[in-house]
């Protein structure tokens, strides 16, 4: 049904070669009317363009509806996108509420480049654990300096507003993923009006954005929306992406906000629709065991097969094994110390005791580990959960205690369980069951400051190459210093050329600098590109290092 609807919508393309006025490039004509953007020196921006009706009132907890309003006046596209309502880990203090429920927009950034009439397109899905973040969380000055690509940033519903689910057809969940998909359809239909090439669209994302990109790829009709995709440090098999236990969390959410009498999904949904969005989102604090743990209490789920417009109704592993996913070139990545998110927060010194949280793990490991590493709802019994916790501790720390001195072993555990292992599994499954090229790289080149220092609130620890150290060379982020080192400047330009060449490649070839990625499909071994400050190297492996 969803696929049929997509084909119908794609059949109604509204593409006009004269949609942008050559005499006034800030003025763009869309089916909804005219809009005016901003001149930023070396690029134009057209921000906060609605692609869906506001998901409020009766449209809360429903699949997004295409935006149909007509503008009688010229739409002001100079306003930066608002955050979707969220409980933001990176806001200091107890009140972490931010954003607005009416937030479903895309923002378009077009180079000033008189040497070409049209541009390939990169669509970005932001990260933030499916709980926070936004289209404006990453900058785009590095990206736009090359002048070769149009960038489109997507906003989508987050946290309980985007992902609460009772596991049945009545409150199916995955609303944020459905938002992303409708935004991709909007881009396909409208980007030509901005000078974009609808036949050359690359979709990328980092962390939860990377997991989102992979989930989009796992829909067969994604091939009608994009030409290729890259998932940076996040994929559909990461244990924090698609989780179990959603129904219990949905009814617990209802109890917290005053829907305690709801005994079925229909009643719960009706009650939740009547509550202020701020109350629903603020209830996230009740699902956190300590600090911002677990970092994804609400995220993607496997929907009931009878759910209307279900996004996925099988586990990603089963979808990949079936071969019924989009056959487009896809790359998946990780960094050598990706687990710095969220392990680094355990090194923050507590105001009350003056000691680091990591010390408390010695007494709380069996309580906290299932939430830190996302196996609380996947284990059948408490004994299974405790046995796994014990196994992990023994494997990575042996008989040593948790301390600042043993932090790197804990961070290695986080990297393996939350990122690296599932990246290898995804790659292995795709090479066995896919037809289009599938690539992978590992990045090892620590930033001077990054997300590790931000979470730990200290600069005396070496965290290695943590979550985002590669992606933030493409899109600036406040967790690191804006000035790039000379080696990072080279890598940044190589990344941008990699994106440009990938989206234009007719056979799905991917290259970085002097290295051409090796395709994993049909390969007897894993093909992994290693990227460091000294260059790049193709590795052929039995398993990831």
UniProtKB/Swiss-Prot annotation:
Compartment(s): Secreted
Reported effect, residue 171 to F: In strain: JR-106
Expression (tissue specificity): Eye and hemolymph.
Effect annotated for changing residue 313 to T: In strain: GB-329, GB-336, JR-32 and JR-460
Pfam families, per database record: COesterase
CDD domains reported in the protein's UniProt record: Esterase_lipase (cd00312)
Variant or mutagenesis effect after changing residue 24 to Y: In strain: GB-336
Effect of residue 110 to R: In strain: GB-115, JR-50, JR-106, JR-126, JR-142, JR-198, JR-341 and JR-382
Source taxon at top rank: Eukaryota
Reactions that this protein is recorded to catalyse: a carboxylic ester + H2O = an alcohol + a carboxylate + H(+)
Disulfide bridge partners, by residue number: 84-103, 259-271, 515-536
Phenotype for residue 248 to L: In strain: JR-38 and JR-382
GO CC annotations on file: extracellular region
Signal sequence, renumbered to the chain: 1-19
E.C. code: 3.1.1.1
GO molecular function: carboxylesterase activity
Outcome (variant: residue 327 to K): In strain: GB-336, JR-126 and JR-460
Consequence of changing residue 211 to A: In strain: JR-126
Result of changing residue 26 to M: In strain: GB-4, JR-126 and JR-460
Major place of residence: secreted
Keyword annotations of the record: Disulfide bond, Glycoprotein, Hydrolase, Secreted, Serine esterase, Signal
Active site positions: 207, 467
Presence of keyword Secreted: yes
Subunit structure, interactors included: Homodimer.
Family statement drawn from the similarity comment of this UniProt entry: Belongs to the type-B carboxylesterase/lipase family.
Protein name: Esterase-5B
Species of provenance: Drosophila pseudoobscura pseudoobscura
